[in-house]
């Protein structure tokens, strides 16, 4: 009996083991091994599962709620092949992922070649920056995803990089091409990179959001179209009246696009001339003469003058009578300037970006006069200016577009970016590295080096005069007092001096009263006349008999 019981228990245990083994085998068989050894002597080969394509990448999650109710096409720019799968989107929302190739920029195309110091304004050419030309359905996308090059980027200076410019222009080109094909089609551009896009092409007003290194924009296509009309640098004079469809980058055979020409200004804009006075009244006379010269040229555009508390009520009355609409501002100190230096408060000029009740402004320094009507400048985009030296522009006259977010950006960057000259010009050149060249006729600087300007005269086709050195109203009208000071003779010209006084002569007696001489001004003039006489300066201007009536009618201080 005991033996039977023992055998029975053994059978039950064996059956239990078999059932457990079968259960474990059933669990193991459905799983495939992650690797296998192909032969005893071969190298170990590991077959890993294929990476899963990201069906809902971050850029899509960010803009999903902005997309139209249709299947979208996505264009990718500057996305490395190894990264493509992680950025591509799949699913019912996406019709097609299109990777747009970028041709290499020739090695001889550098930033200096795009921004030469001097050009022949009548016959200049620019290097070519190749832009992609998608054809057919590939040229019509709803979203552009572009990785922006950030090599060399720093928060302390501007980034002048031709590859970065190419990617930004390519994104703009593709957006405009797509927007032409469907009326009122919105195109979104997503930039990936810590430095973000070039704000000269994609301004902050068009930014939908920024999340870490993702920058989402909904560009205003008429403005973007005009950007693409501009030369790729200051290597050519920017056109003011241009038609879309005639850009250098557009193939001539695309007649269907060229027929959709629009003027550079898509709608009626509110525009104005603007200048700034701060810290002293030294330029009140200059601002009055500037306003009068604008009116004498035939322009009837609005004129805005920003001023701080240092401008007296008496001067404000004269400025208003000259034609300026007055607005009080608080000064802005240049963060890197020395205390009590001449440029300590020059960043006050940045306040012009706060004049947001206007779409476009032409800023002009108060030591300018206008000789020919300059209203055509309002057709230029931000930032347009005349060249200064090297790759830099002169901020004495510039076309800009007011913007609250741009002003905020300028303020934030003013504490990080140090100006090369301590003033606004050096700072703005680090902000707007991609600018558009105006003719030197618009900003003809009163400067004469002995090598090129021995006669100290200017051509007759000058449209705007920028008075460097001692200003005409602090000299006798009889001659340019820059002649009396050796180191200032590069600014001296009697013929250019006379042009300012022609504007003065057409002013009312009330306005002329703001341009008089006081006793201290006369003493300074006479001091340098004596020094010039003692040094026997060869031009002998110190011998000229002074007949300026202001000399005998000095202002009471």
Curated annotation (Swiss-Prot):
This enzyme's EC code(s): 2.4.1.-
One Gene Ontology cellular component annotation held by this UniProt entry: Golgi membrane
Cofactor: Mn(2+)
EC category: transferase
Membrane topology classification: Single-pass type II membrane protein
Highest taxon above the source species: Eukaryota
Record-annotated membrane-spanning stretches: 11-31
Binding site for substrate: 365-367, 394-396, 421-425, 466-471
The name this protein goes by in its record: Putative UDP-glucuronate:xylan alpha-glucuronosyltransferase 4
Organism in which the protein naturally occurs: Arabidopsis thaliana
């Amino acid at each position: 009996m005991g033996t039977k019981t023992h055998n029975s228990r053994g059978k039950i245990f064996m059956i239990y083991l078999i059932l457990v083994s079968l259960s474990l085998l059933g669990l193991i068989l459905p799983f495939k091994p992650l690797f296998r050894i192909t032969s005893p002597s071969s190298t170990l080969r590991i077959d890993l599962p294929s990476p899963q394509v990201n069906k809902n990448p971050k850029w899509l999650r960010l803009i999903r709620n902005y997309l139209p109710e249709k299947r979208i096409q996505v264009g990718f720019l500057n996305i490395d092949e190894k990264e493509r799968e992680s950025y591509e989107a799949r699913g019912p929302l996406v019709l097609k992922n299109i990777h747009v190739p970028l041709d290499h920029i020739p090695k001889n195309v550098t930033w200096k070649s795009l921004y030469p110091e001097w050009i022949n304004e009548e016959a200049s050419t620019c290097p070519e920056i190749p832009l992609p030309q998608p054809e057919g359905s590939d040229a019509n996308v709803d979203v552009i995803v572009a990785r922006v090059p950030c090599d060399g980027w720093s928060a302390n200076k501007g980034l002048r990089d031709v590859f970065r410019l190419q990617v930004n222009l390519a994104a703009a080109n593709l957006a405009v091409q797509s927007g032409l094909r469907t009326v009122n089609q919105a195109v979104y551009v997503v930039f990936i990179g810590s430095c973000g896009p070039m704000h000269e092409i994609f301004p902050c007003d068009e930014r939908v959001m920024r999340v870490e290194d993702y920058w989402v924009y909904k560009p205003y296509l008429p403005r973007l179209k005009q950007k693409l009309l501009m030369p790729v640098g200051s290597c050519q004079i920017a056109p003011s009246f241009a038609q879309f469809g005639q850009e250098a980058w557009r193939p001539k055979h695309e007649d269907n696009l060229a027929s959709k020409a629009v003027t550079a200004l898509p709608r009626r804009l509110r525009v104005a001339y603007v200048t700034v006075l701060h810290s002293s009244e030294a330029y009140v006379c200059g601002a009055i003469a500037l306003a009068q010269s604008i009116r004498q040229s035939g322009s009837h555009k609005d004129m805005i003058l920003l001023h701080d508390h240092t401008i007296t009520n008496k001067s404000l009355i004269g400025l208003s009578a000259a034609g300026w609409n007055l607005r009080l501002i608080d000064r802005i100190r240049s963060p890197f300037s020395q205390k009590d230096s001449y440029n300590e408060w020059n960043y006050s000029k940045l306040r012009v970006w706060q004049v947001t009740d206007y779409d476009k402004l032409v800023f002009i320094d108060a030591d300018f006069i206008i000789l020919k009507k300059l209203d055509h400048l309002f057709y230029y985009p931000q930032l347009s200016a005349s060249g200064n030296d090297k790759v830099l522009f002169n901020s004495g006259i510039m076309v800009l577009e007011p913007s609250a977010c741009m002003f905020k950006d300028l303020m934030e960057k003013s504490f990080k970016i140090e100006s090369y000259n301590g003033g606004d010009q050096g700072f703005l050149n680090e902000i707007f590295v991609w600018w558009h060249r105006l003719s030197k006729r618009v900003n003809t600087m009163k400067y004469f080096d002995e090598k090129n300007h021995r006669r100290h005269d200017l051509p007759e086709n000058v449209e705007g005069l920028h008075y460097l050195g001692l200003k005409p109203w602090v000299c006798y009208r009889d001659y340019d007092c820059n002649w009396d000071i050796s180191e200032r003779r590069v600014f001296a010209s009697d013929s250019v001096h006379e042009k300012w006084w022609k504007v003065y002569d057409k002013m009312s007696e009330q306005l002329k009263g703001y341009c008089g001489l006081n006793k201290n001004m006369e003493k300074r003039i006479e001091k340098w006349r004596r020094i010039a006489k003692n040094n026997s300066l060869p031009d002998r201007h110190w011998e000229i008999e002074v007949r300026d009536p202001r000399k005998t009618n000095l202002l009471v201080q």
